[in-house]
């Protein structure tokens, strides 16, 4: 999956934020603008091409002053935001870009 394809859907405003993602964003005080900026300025750190119903990816970026992750699925006719979260230091390394073993 290419980040450019994901960004294109964001720029076209052709995305859906799932109920779960909305809840997580509310819990973390992450706005839709924050999410859009995270995706437009972020990068893919994990790719899940065999995800169902659509291929998905984990994107890392910055919201405010914090590292933030978003899982998105690139479906045939839209982008779906699955979840958004603050990565935990003990689970990630390399500036929150690689999972610890």
Roles of regions detected by a PLM:
Residues 1-101:
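Ribonuclease/tRNase effector modules and their secretory precursors
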């Amino acid at each position: 999956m290419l980040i450019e394809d994901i960004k294109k859907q964001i720029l076209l405003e052709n995305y859906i934020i799932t109920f779960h993602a909305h809840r997580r964003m509310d819990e973390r005080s992450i706005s839709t603008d924050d999410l859009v900026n995270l995706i437009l300025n972020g990068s893919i750190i994990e790719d899940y091409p065999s995800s169902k119903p659509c291929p998905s990816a984990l994107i890392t970026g910055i919201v405010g002053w914090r590292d933030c992750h978003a899982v998105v699925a690139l479906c045939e006719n839209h982008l779906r935001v699955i979840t958004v979260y603050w990565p935990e230091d003990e689970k990630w390394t390399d500036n929150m870009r690689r999972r610890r073993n």
